[in-house]
Design a protein with these regions (language model features):
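Contiguous beta-strand segments within globular domains
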Residues: 85-103, 191-212
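Solvent-exposed serine/threonine-rich low-complexity stretches and specific carbohydrate-binding patches
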Residues: 122-134, 226-240, 273-275
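Edge beta-strands of extracellular beta-sandwich domains
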Residues: 162-170, 265-279
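VWA/integrin I-like adhesion module and closely mimicked acidic/polar interface patches used
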Residues: 1, 19-48, 53-55, 65-67
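Surface-exposed, short loops/turns at beta-strand junctions within beta-sandwich domains
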Residues: 145-148, 246-253
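Conserved structural position at the C-terminal beta-strand
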Residues: 156, 258-260
């Protein structure tokens, strides 16, 4: 899986695009990514479950923190991407008690601010114990240990292309999602990965493997994180970590999310980062 793409556009000297932005925005408001980001980068990152983070040329030496921390944080608890015209946008997501540490990687092409709020509503203090806060021209990367459970919030202020991804170190994992079809020799039939594309508006069988208990449901989401449709997957009677059920994809592009509750009753969610594509 390709996890990170650093856009080359972020390493170029600002041109008229950035100059137009600066004429509208407060003085000193940085705008990394001098030209429009190549959509090929964005699509490749989305398809593989990776992300685009825009670094200025002067920040290249500090970009390694994203890959170093990414190796430690394998579970996606939240992700969204899109384009912010102007203003701000808030994102909320649950953090459960199984999470040992979190990695926030938020990139916004023309960043005014990126703010992280704890469940209490207090802003995350960069100097707090266990917090490694890294700020860039076009975003923020924060690694923190032992986050308190509850609903966290990220607010981005600015404009342009954005990716907001939150990953965790946790034993609860949605580690496999696959569309399958019935096959095998007579008397030895079973489900195998589909060899044909996923089809739009047709019934197909979906399997998911979850490490962890307390699963309450599955759903499809789009690239922006909005729910598209609920999914009725049932646990295998012989293996409570395996789930399967018929699915009729009603949207062309989607991701799969599992939701549940931990042993203390806190809600959790895990996102399978790969973007699925359904063809007519």
């Amino acid at each position: 899986m390709l996890r990170y793409l650093v856009s080359a556009m972020a390493l170029l000297t600002p041109n008229s695009f950035a100059q137009q932005q600066s004429s509208q925005n407060p003085p000193g408001w940085p705008c990394a990514g001098a030209r429009a980001v190549d959509p090929t980068y964005v699509q490749l990152a989305e398809n593989t479950g990776g992300e685009v983070f825009l670094f200025d040329r002067s920040e290249s030496a500090r970009s390694l923190v994203l890959m170093q921390e990414g190796m430690k944080h394998k579970e996606t608890v939240f992700r969204t991407s899109g384009t912010l015209a102007r203003g701000y946008r808030d994102f909320q997501f649950p953090v459960d008690t199984t999470i040992e540490s979190l990695l926030f990687s938020i990139s916004l092409q023309c960043t005014q601010s990126v703010v992280i709020y704890r469940p209490s509503g207090a802003e995350l203090d960069a100097s707090a114990p266990g917090v490694d806060d890294n700020r860039y021209h076009a975003g923020r990367i924060v690694a923190m240990s032992r986050p308190e459970p509850g609903v966290w919030q990220v607010r981005i202020v600015g404009s342009g292309l954005f990716f907001a991804v939150v990953e965790a170190k946790s034993d609860v994992s949605l580690h496999s999602v696959r569309f399958v079809q019935l096959g095998g020799r007579p008397g030895h039939e079973g489900y195998f990965p589909m060899t044909t594309p996923v089809r739009l508006n047709l019934p197909q069988m979906l399997q998911a493997s979850v490490s962890g208990s307390g699963v309450t449901g599955f759903r499809m989401i789009n690239s922006g994180g909005a729910t598209l449709q609920p999914l009725a997957l049932a646990a295998d009677e012989n293996d409570q970590e395996e789930f399967q059920g018929p699915v009729i994809p009603s949207h062309k592009d989607f991701r799969i999310v599992v939701e549940g509750r931990d042993s203390r009753g806190y809600p959790y969610q895990r996102i399978f980062p790969r973007l699925f594509h359904a063809e007519p």
